């Protein structure tokens, strides 16, 4: 059944929004895996775990925002299978942060692609929505992860375990 409210909403943009929802949910799933990996008793980096669990929550909320947009525009939400994280054991914080940075760069590219598609299809509402709710936050998160990686690399070396512990305590400290 077609929507009575649908206007100037191309099927290509609708499909791209659904793909982006899936990517957000996959990112959330990955961050949930990371968050609970670092909270294990044999890893015990609670601050790192908290950082990734907060990201999981943010990505799930982003997916929900996109689903609300889909309904507001008269599109139909298609729930695709969410692929499991690429691994179960994440290693050191630096390895995990590198994996997370790759996830964010892929998400950012998908957002940019959707923005370009919406612009080409004459859909300023989608462009405005992405600019106000996603693009700036994504760039800030990529910068933050890049900064964390720089600091983790500085701390690597013969005492890498101590460096990782100090990074977790001093950078990712939370209440």
From Swiss-Prot:
SUPFAM superfamilies linked: Ferritin-like (SSF47240)
Keyword Lipoprotein: no
PROSITE patterns assigned to the protein according to its UniProt record, in alphabetical order: FERRITIN_1, FERRITIN_2, FERRITIN_LIKE
InterPro entries per UniProt: Ferritin, Ferritin-like, Ferritin-like_diiron, Ferritin-like_SF, Ferritin_CS, Ferritin_DPS_dom
Modified residues (N-acetylserine): 2
Annotated residues for binding of Fe cation: 54, 58, 61, 64
One Gene Ontology cellular component annotation held by this UniProt entry: cytoplasm
Subcellular location: Cytoplasmic vesicle, Autophagosome; Cytoplasm; Autolysosome
Transmembrane segments: none
GO molecular function: ferric iron binding; ferrous iron binding; iron ion binding
Subunit structure: Oligomer of 24 subunits. There are two types of subunits: L (light) chain and H (heavy) chain. The major chain can be light or heavy, depending on the species and tissue type. The functional molecule forms a roughly spherical shell with a diameter of 12 nm and contains a central cavity into which the insoluble mineral iron core is deposited. Interacts with NCOA4.
Identification of the protein by name: Ferritin light chain
